Amino acid sequence: MKTVSHHSALIYVMVIVAAADGIMSPNELRSIGVLVKTLPVFRDFDTTRLVAVSQECGEVLQEADGLAAALGLVADALPEHLCETAYWLALEIALSDNKVALEEIRVIETIRRKLGIERLIAAAIERGARARHQTA
């Protein structure tokens, strides 16, 4: 059975959301790169592997029941204390285009359920992410 590291699982979450609407935009790709390079959770991740990990996720998503398989790998790899981080990363990628597609909303909700994040906690994370992306 395939397994992934917690770093890969977090990257999978971002790739899954970016690919949800069928188009991985330049803003989404740029955001993934910036987040991986700057967040403390990725401090000991070899950033030269980012493209390879993203491609691995894409391959999993292409399989039958790919979304379920990818999210299963994510859920198995993430310790409980990183599930909220994963959810926030999903929101960051969805918001990076300044618009959130319906497909992305569905995938984010699926991620929330798969990671066992309570609705109230999810709402707080969502509000924080939305506030971060507000413009005047």
PLM feature segments, named:
Residues 1-136:
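Small-residue-enriched hydrophobic alpha-helices in membranes
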